[in-house]
């Protein structure tokens, strides 16, 4: 019997309980979710309700803004920039996990200009983070106005940039597939690193899409991975080339993980094509504004009037598309 295993990415951390506990909307704790009995959905080694009481019946302090310095800026394409940012030691140490991301903002802008950006690479020795940013609208355009040696506001750490994290952590000494397209090449790098660290044979299927060059090539060269470049998506469907590659691989190898870093439609089509017999993980494409589950930008509605806050909810990818209401 299959059932949905859900988790809160912040549970058991220094940021738990959060503001959702104050309004009776905690993802895991029944006592802090408008119920009157103890029935934790997923025990994380600490009692969230007890932490709430000990903290004076209020949420713990949230993430902080840090004024950081841009140590390098590269213009890769007309709409793609790569920033390397010097951050405090404690922040750099908190962003090493797959799925880590931060909110970036031009210091001259108001807080609603915060843009969620996934970590592409992190250097814990020099305390720098590297991010790739697709410049498409107001938030990212204001960030693009900043140049090397100028200051930028960084808010973090956040960790829910990837769904199905448990499958990534559990994938060891096996064969793993990563499919990445367009800007999804950037958040794929920490996943590749983790899978290689866990002694997996990793195959990367990369699609540059509209970009002229593979902007993660230098990172990939540092690891012993197999790279296949092909078009993955065309006219709303998977390409025949991708289908053939995937079919050959699942027939030849015992695959312990399939990770997709791309648009929701690509993730959905891959899972639809290969079925439920595999462990999946994917990038979290939910719209985010506050990162704390409060503003509602990240919410998705499902059958049974269920609302999921995707900036905090950690769940298998198939449950993000199964039973989802579009209206």
Question: Residues of each region from the PLM?
Answer:
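Short, charged low-complexity linear segments at domain edges
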Residues: 1-25, 259-287, 326-327
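Long terminal accessory regions outside catalytic cores
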Residues: 1-69
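Short Fe-S-cluster ligation motifs
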Residues: 6, 53-74, 301, 311-327
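Local cysteine-cluster metal-coordination motifs and their immediate loop/turn environment
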Residues: 15-42, 264-265, 285-317
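Ferredoxin-reductase
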Residues: 56-150
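FNR/FR-type flavoprotein reductase catalytic core
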Residues: 141-287
């Amino acid at each position: 019997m299959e059932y949905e295993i859900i988790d809160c990415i912040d549970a058991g951390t220094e940021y738990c309980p959060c503001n959702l506990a104050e309004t009776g909307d905690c993802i895991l704790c029944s006592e802090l979710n408008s119920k009157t009995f103890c029935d934790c959905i997923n025990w994380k080694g600490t009692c969230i309700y007890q932490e709430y009481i000990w903290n004076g019946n209020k949420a713990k302090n949230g993430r902080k803004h840090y004024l950081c310095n841009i140590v390098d800026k590269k213009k890769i394409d007309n709409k793609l920039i790569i920033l390397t940012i010097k951050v405090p030691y404690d922040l750099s140490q908190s962003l090493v996990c797959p799925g880590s991301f931060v909110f970036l903002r031009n210091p001259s802008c108001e807080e609603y200009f915060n843009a969620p950006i996934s970590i592409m690479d992190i250097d814990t020795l020099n305390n720098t983070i590297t991010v790739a940013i697709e410049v498409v609208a107001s938030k990212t355009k204001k960030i693009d106005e900043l140049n090397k040696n100028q200051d930028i506001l960084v808010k973090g750490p956040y960790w829910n940039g990837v769904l199905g994290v448990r499958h990534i952590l559990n994938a060891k000494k096996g064969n793993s597939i990563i499919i990445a397209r367009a800007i999804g090449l950037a958040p794929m790098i920490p996943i590749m690193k983790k899978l290689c660290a866990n002694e997996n044979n990793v195959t990367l299927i990369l699609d540059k899409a509209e970009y002229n060059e593979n902007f993660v090539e230098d990172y990939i060269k540092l690891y012993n991975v197999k790279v296949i470049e092909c078009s993955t998506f065309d006219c709303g469907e998977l390409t025949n080339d991708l289908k053939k590659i995937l079919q050959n691989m699942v027939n030849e190898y015992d695959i312990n993980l399939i990770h997709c870093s791309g648009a929701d439609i690509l993730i959905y089509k891959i899972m639809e094509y290969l079925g439920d017999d595999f462990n999946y993980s994917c990038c979290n494409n939910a719209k985010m504004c506050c990162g704390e589950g409060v503003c509602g930008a990240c919410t998705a509605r499902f059958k049974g009037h269920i609302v999921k806050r995707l900036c905090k909810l950690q769940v298998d990818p198939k449950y993000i598309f199964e039973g989802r209401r579009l209206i």
